[in-house]
């Protein structure tokens, strides 16, 4: 009996450690949750044909799909600018005492846009739209979202660091602005890779899709 009781205690301790590890990563988990919430709300907004969905769909149709293919450098910059704007927003939110509260609005918004565009393409072009999403949107979008989510984690940490520094209730060891902006530079690599992948896919497969 004592052996069985010991095993149960060890198992409970093992599960409690896993739960604690899970909760300790909340700074990365919450942005991921907001991302999926944005994607789902974008699809729901498309199904209900909300006003914001129509704005996103019109912009995607008239600006993204209708434009002519540019030079390789121009295409790369075009795909780099959009997610870079989101990263800049996350960066400056992290320098605010309210950053930990507002930062998750960024992956929510980006996820909403992905959801809107995906629903629009599938709803209007079915299999052709789905193929476009799988080839042209999802590889690019996933890498951009990865960068945004990782930067959100750093933004929340920086905002907490500022709050604790001001209130003098505590401080993070080995953390500060230098670590903060360096982490953003590292995570920006995912945006660069995403833009390069999107540019290559556009030149390889862009001609297969005409809407």
Model region roles, listed by residue range:
Residues 103-126:
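Conserved mixed alpha/beta catalytic, RNA-binding, or beta-rich assembly cores of soluble enzyme
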Residues 136-160:
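Alpha-helical transmembrane segments of helical membrane proteins, especially in multi-pass transport
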Residues 18-53:
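N-terminal signal-anchor transmembrane alpha helix
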Residues 53-74:
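Perimembrane loop-to-helix junctions flanking transmembrane segments
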Residues 77-110:
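Hydrophobic alpha-helical transmembrane segments
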Residues 34-41, 86, 143-147, 190, ...:
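Alpha-helical transmembrane segments of multipass membrane proteins
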Residues 151-211:
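Terminal transmembrane helical module of multi-pass membrane proteins
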Residues 9-25, 170-179:
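Cytosolic juxtamembrane amphipathic/interface segments immediately preceding
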